[in-house]
């Protein structure tokens, strides 16, 4: 059982290295008398003797076997324990065989006893401690394995016994040893006192220092190891146990070399991966050679950077070879059929070393002249799709007739986005043939009588030439189409007469060009009036005719009165203010049934406007919780509102600072008078006001994410394009509502737009732009014509003439679009306000922000038309954004750096890196100065090293925002391209 048990002992319990023994006392090293204390004096005797190697040593012997009452003690000198908890005693001695002594009494013994006595200092005397078992502590009775006889003495044969005993725990500063003899005949040749400790060892990647053994033979003293240089703990804290014999047992846990370092010298050293090799993860595995087309720039690399012109996709593992962009597709074949086209091609000669090759089709319409080509509209259809084609063919339809097109077939793969260069492409030029117009999409009923119906329709989406005329086909619904009648019309409106009363008719229309008729539209059903309906409509119109006449008369009188009043006032008010006020009176007739905004400053008593449009709230219903900001008139707080019978809601509370003037109070509450007239999901909602107690408050719904510009900057790069378009659509819908009410905002900007927890954007800050004349602290607003104007957001006619209209709000909305797509970047960057005015006067416009779809930038440019009459209405903007949301593919085409638009764009390209002396200057130029220290501490201090940075390197220096990562990576890619250009010139 014993041998079998030993074979099955777990390896973890076997000692790793031999114990270290530290000697406290060794009698063999004495060069003079030992001077140990004996009792009685006739007992032990110190003599010179020889060890087994015949070296002279000092020994003690005793042999009083023929004497009576033998109790002989031998006590060592004071021995200091030096921190040891368990003491070991090695004794070498010889014992005479009692049977070999002639006439020996029966009391002869062949053993002796070992004792110890602890003391904090050397306190022993001739009589202390007492020469008896108590106070001494007995260790053991020592017996000899071998005894010598008279024969051995004659032959000079030495039979020396060696015994080791241990005792503990010891706690005092030192101790004495004592040897007791009872009628024995023996010689104590050597005594060595020592303690054991576990040696310093490097095991499992950790360094364990020397550790004293425990106080008991079964003790296990835990010792924490420290990982060797460039290693880290795995799983659990690493430790081993030192047993009572000074042996390491039970190792737990381990350390492994960090990424970039491999284990050498039997696991005692973590060495940095040599140049040309790398190690990506922590572990025992060694460094491996860099994949193809990659290299390392220093020792200890965790990955290999791609060589110039080669890249690694975000999803590629680090041990994958670096690849490059594919070459252009080959052998393009085109087949044109009227206004459709089939394109086929063969794959590129070089796929770049990757298997994820796909194709993108870029369609450009070049018209029939020699003008610049523009991207095709959304009406062109691509089958199976325009982007991400896996097969080398595509069918394109719904092209315009007699039109020249250029199609670029781009070859792209997983690293195309990593390259600073545009994808390689093959292009083909085609001209479409003559084709008939497309079908009319929809018809509208303009009016009807008992015997006639007037219809109108829009032009076909693709007329494919000049529309010569239209043919309208109609028949009674309950009859066959064979009974149809055709009517021709040179315009898109026709009145069909001689119809039956109260009858449903089916109508279809088609357009004609020189190429012939197009397809009929879908069937539309319209019904003539019955006689009863006709009589009823006549009776209903009679009061309307009388009322309209009366209203017209009242309107004329009102205009005359206004003119007289204005003349009497001698044009006391400025032209812009008069125009604004007159607009409120004269535009009401434009949208019947539509609520019209009323300027509170037209009230003789502005407090009356507050009472009319804002609900008074009792102060007891309002609970202010914390200050979240400061406004023009006082603090902005968050809190709760609990109205009787309603649930408690979270609200924002604007307070009027103490010491206000009556004018400040009136101006403060005017915003509530304005806001209280609005009710739209994309316009901030007024809950009410507190005017009958102090402080005066305006209470609105609470918007959790605060102002849009700050929110975007805090979440740079975190949203999809569709999410951003959704935000823009909300702002446009709110502005359409305000424009329909004839309200001009004057200060539309991302800072004046609030965002709630559902990313719903709401227009806010109403009427405050009227009072900015008193605010000299905000550099956003610059003096112009006696007032303060936010130059960067304001239309040129409003800057020059203070002519604010819904069209000038559209200009501001275009700037808001730019702010949203750039994640809150400052419009016109660090240009001065005067430089902005000059640039706009010279027809310069902002370029597309990074990753901005072309369709969105084109909409911005439409908003920035110099002629305000050419700018889109907010309703048109909402419709355009709705189309983009319904057709996300329209947002995939990114705006080029140099747009094909007529307006020149301000240059905000990345400057040449050679114009900078240091990496810090380069970071300043790309507005990433907050990462200077991180770059320096990580060793990225030269342009050569920076140009080789990868996404992993950028993450390692602490750039965690996706937008910042993309901006830095784009700049590095441009830097590489500039370096390659310089190298090619040098060659």
UniProtKB/Swiss-Prot annotation:
GO biological process entries: angiogenesis; axon guidance; axonal fasciculation; dendritic spine development; dendritic spine morphogenesis; ephrin receptor signaling pathway; peptidyl-tyrosine phosphorylation; positive regulation of synapse assembly
> Per the database record, which ranges form the Eph LBD domain?
21-203
Report the function annotation for this chain.
Answer: Receptor tyrosine kinase which binds promiscuously transmembrane ephrin-B family ligands residing on adjacent cells, leading to contact-dependent bidirectional signaling into neighboring cells. The signaling pathway downstream of the receptor is referred to as forward signaling while the signaling pathway downstream of the ephrin ligand is referred to as reverse signaling. Functions in axon guidance during development. In addition to axon guidance, also regulates dendritic spines development and maturation and stimulates the formation of excitatory synapses.
Give residues for the crosslink Glycyl lysine isopeptide (Lys-Gly) (interchain with G-Cter in ubiquitin): 892
Entry's Gene Ontology cellular component terms: axon; dendrite; plasma membrane
CDD domains reported in the protein's UniProt record: EphR_LBD_B2 (cd10477), FN3 (cd00063), PTKc_EphR_B (cd05065), SAM_EPH-B2 (cd09552), TNFRSF (cd00185)
Gene3D superfamilies assigned: ephrin a2 ectodomain, Galactose-binding domain-like, Immunoglobulins, Phosphorylase Kinase, domain 1, Transcription Factor, Ets-1, Transferase(Phosphotransferase) domain 1, Tumor Necrosis Factor Receptor, subunit A, domain 2
Please list the residue ranges that the record places on the Cytoplasmic side of the membrane. Answer: 566-987
Q: Which residues form the Fibronectin type-III domain?
A: 325-435, 436-531
Similarity annotation: Belongs to the protein kinase superfamily. Tyr protein kinase family. Ephrin receptor subfamily.
Q: Entry's PANTHER family? A: EPH RECEPTOR A5, EPHRIN TYPE-B RECEPTOR 2
Top-level enzyme category: transferase
Please give, as recorded in its UniProt entry, the membrane topology of this protein. Single-pass type I membrane protein
Oligomeric and partner information: Heterotetramer upon binding of the ligand. The heterotetramer is composed of an ephrin dimer and a receptor dimer. Oligomerization is probably required to induce biological responses.
Q: Which residues face the membrane's Extracellular side?
A: 20-544
This one is known as: Ephrin type-B receptor 2
Give the disulfide map: 63-185, 98-108
């Amino acid at each position: 059982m014993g041998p079998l048990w030993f074979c099955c002992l777990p390896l973890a319990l076997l000692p790793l290295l031999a114990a270290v023994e530290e000697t406290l006392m060794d009698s063999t090293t004495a060069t003079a008398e030992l001077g140990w204390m004996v009792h009685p004096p006739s007992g032990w005797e110190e003599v010179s003797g020889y060890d087994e190697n015949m070296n002279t040593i000092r020994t003690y012997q005793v042999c009083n076997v023929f004497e009576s009452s033998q109790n002989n003690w031998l006590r060592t000198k004071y021995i200091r324990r030096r921190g040891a908890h368990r003491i070991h005693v090695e004794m070498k001695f010889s014992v005479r065989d009692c049977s070999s002594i002639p006439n020996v009494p029966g009391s002869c013994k062949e053993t002796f006893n070992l004792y110890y006595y602890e003391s904090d200092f050397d306190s022993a005397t001739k009589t202390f401690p007492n020469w008896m078992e108590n106070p001494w502590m007995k260790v053991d009775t020592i017996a000899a394995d071998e005894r010598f006889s008279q024969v051995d003495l004659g032959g000079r044969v030495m039979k020396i016994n060696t015994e080791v005993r241990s005792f503990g725990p010891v706690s005092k500063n030192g101790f004495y040893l004592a040897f007791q003899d009872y009628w024995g005949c023996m010689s104590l040749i050597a005594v060595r006192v020592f303690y054991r400790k576990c040696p310093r060892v490097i095991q499992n990647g950790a360094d364990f220092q020397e550790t004293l053994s425990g106080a008991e033979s079964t003790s296990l003293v835990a010792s924490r190891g420290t990982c060797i240089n460039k290693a880290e703990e795995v799983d659990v804290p690493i430790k081993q146990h030192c047993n009572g014999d000074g042996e390491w047992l039970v190792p737990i846990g381990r350390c492994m070399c960090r990424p970039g370092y491999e284990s050498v010298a039997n696991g005692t050293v973590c060495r940095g991966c040599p140049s040309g090799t790398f190690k990506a993860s922590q572990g025992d595995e060694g460094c491996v050679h860099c994949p193809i087309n990659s290299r390392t720039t220093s020792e200890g690399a965790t990955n290999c950077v791609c060589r110039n012109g080669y890249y690694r996709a975000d999803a590629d593992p680090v041990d994958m070879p670096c690849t490059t962009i594919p070459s252009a597709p080959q052998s393009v074949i085109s087949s044109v059929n009227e206004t459709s086209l089939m394109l086929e091609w063969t794959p590129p000669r070089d796929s770049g070393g990757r298997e994820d090759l796909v194709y993108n089709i870029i369609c450009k319409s070049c018209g029939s002249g020699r003008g610049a080509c523009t991207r095709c509209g959304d009406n062109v259809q691509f089958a199976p799709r325009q982007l991400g084609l896996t097969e080398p063919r595509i069918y394109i339809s719904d092209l315009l007739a007699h039109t020249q097109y250029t199609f670029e077939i781009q070859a792209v793969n997983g690293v195309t986005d990593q390259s600073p260069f545009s994808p390689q492409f093959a292009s083909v030029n085609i001209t479409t043939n003559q084709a008939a117009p497309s079908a009319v999409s929809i018809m509208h009923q303009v009016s009807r009588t008992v015997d006639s119906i007037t219809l109108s329709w829009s032009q076909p989406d693709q007329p494919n030439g000049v529309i010569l005329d239209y043919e309208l086909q109609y028949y009674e619904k309950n009859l066959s189409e064979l009974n149809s009648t055709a009517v021709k019309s040179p315009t898109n409106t026709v009145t069909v007469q001689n119809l039956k009363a109260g009858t449903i008719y089916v109508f279809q229309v088609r357009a004609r060009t020189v190429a012939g008729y197009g397809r009929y539209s879908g069937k539309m059903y319209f019904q003539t009036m019955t006689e009863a309906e006709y009589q009823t409509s006549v009776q209903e119109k009679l009061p309307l005719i009388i009322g309209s006449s009366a209203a017209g008369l009242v309107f004329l009188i009102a205009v005359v009165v206004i003119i007289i009043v204005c003349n009497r006032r001698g044009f006391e008010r400025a032209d812009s203010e008069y125009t604004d006020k007159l607009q409120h009176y004269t535009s009401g007739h434009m949208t019947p049934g539509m609520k019209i905004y009323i300027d509170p400053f037209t009230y003789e008593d502005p407090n009356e406007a507050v009472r009319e449009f804002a609900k008074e709230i009792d102060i007891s219903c309002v609970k202010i919780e914390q200050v979240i900001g400061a406004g023009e008139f006082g603090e902005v707080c968050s809190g709760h509102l609990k109205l009787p019978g309603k649930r408690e809601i979270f609200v924002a509370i604007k307070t009027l600072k103490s010491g206000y003037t009556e004018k400040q109070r009136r101006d403060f509450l005017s915003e509530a008078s304005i806001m209280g007239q609005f009710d739209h999901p994309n316009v901030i909602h007024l809950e009410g006001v507190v005017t009958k107690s102090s402080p005066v408050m305006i209470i609105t719904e609470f918007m959790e994410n605060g102002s849009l510009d700050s929110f975007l900057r805090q979440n740079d790069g975190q949203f999809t394009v569709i999410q951003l378009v959704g935000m823009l659509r909300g702002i446009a819908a709110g502005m359409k509502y305000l424009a329909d009410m004839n309200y001009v905002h004057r200060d539309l900007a991302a800072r004046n737009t609030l965002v709630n927890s559902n990313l719903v954007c709401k227009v806010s800050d109403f009427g405050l732009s009227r009072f900015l004349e008193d605010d000299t602290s905000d550099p956003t607003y610059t003096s112009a014509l006696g007032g303060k104007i936010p130059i960067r957001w304001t239309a040129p006619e409003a800057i020059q003439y203070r002519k604010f209209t819904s069209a000038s709000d559209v200009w501001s909305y275009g700037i808001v679009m730019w702010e949203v797509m750039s994640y809150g970047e400052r419009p016109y960057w660090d240009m001065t306000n005067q430089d902005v005015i000059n640039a706009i006067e010279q027809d310069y416009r902002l370029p597309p922000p990074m990753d901005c779809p072309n369709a969105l930038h084109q909409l911005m440019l439409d908003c920035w038309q110099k002629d305000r009459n050419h700018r889109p209405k907010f309703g048109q903007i909402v419709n355009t954004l709705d189309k983009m949301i319904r057709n996300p593919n329209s947002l995939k085409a990114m705006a080029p750096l140099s747009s094909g638009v007529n307006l020149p764009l301000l240059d905000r390209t990345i400057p040449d890196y050679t114009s900078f002396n240091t990496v810090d200057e380069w970071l300043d130029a790309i507005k990433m100065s907050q990462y200077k220290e991180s770059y320096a501490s990580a060793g990225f201090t030269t342009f050569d090293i920076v140009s080789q940075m990868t996404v992993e390197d950028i993450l390692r220096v602490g750039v965690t925002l996706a937008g910042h990562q993309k901006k830095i990576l784009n700049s590095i890619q441009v830097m590489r391209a500039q370096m390659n250009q310089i190298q090619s010139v040098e060659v």
